[in-house]
Amino acid sequence: MSTAVLAVEGLTVYRDTYATVQDVSFALEAGTDTAIVGPNGAGKSTLIQAILGILPRRSGDVFWLGHPLSRRGVLSPKVRQQIAYLPQNFLFDRRIPITVNELVALGWDDLGLKLPWANQKQRRLAVRRALERVDALHLGSQPISRLSGGETKRALLAYCLVRPRRLLILDEASAGLDVRSESDFYQLLYQLKQEQGWAILQISHDLDMVRKHCDRVLCLNRFLRCQGTPDYALAPDNLVAVYGSEFVRYRHHH
């Protein structure tokens, strides 16, 4: 059996004296797309941030390719380079005078460890290919200050794609996209997992899209209420356990 790209065992996170995430365990295999679903305040973003070392975890372990990750601080550069993370609210100062090409190129630069003039040809080609994949090549010369919300999301996704990764983590990345853009987005994720073997972990509120596109689902409401295939995890009884009976009744009548 192959080693999981990422494995989480008994992870618990506290905010002050309250456990926002408690005793969560799951594993991600290469070439799979896993969704985290649950109501607002369920701990979905907290779980992601604890895995990445942005938030401290009270207990539990996180393993990367079978090796335990430290509970102290952020991930090592070696691990970080293999993970792309697109948070729900990616805030940056739009007054920074850089173009989309320059923003995406930052994802190629090995966390600033390489000289900026090294491998310029490969760098330019990687940026071009990343922008092509998200249908944003025409935005390359645009200053980031001029981008719309949807264009900004495409540029940030290109930043994630500009170099090979093992894991892509997305927090409501498809929110705000129109129907065609959303379809293209999920087609891109399918290509990443099928052709390049990326593992994908995404937070989503769109249960219909999760059912259609994801391989596994984690149902979270502080605890991991269930996990499995979409057909199993999104069955009515499990949705009641995660969201409550009123939510399921609303979906049934709408």
Residue positions per predicted region:
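Conserved ABC ATPase signature
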Residues: 143-147, 151
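Helix-to-loop junction immediately C-terminal to a conserved catalytic motif
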Residues: 52
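H-loop/switch region of ABC-family ATPase nucleotide-binding domains
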Residues: 204-205
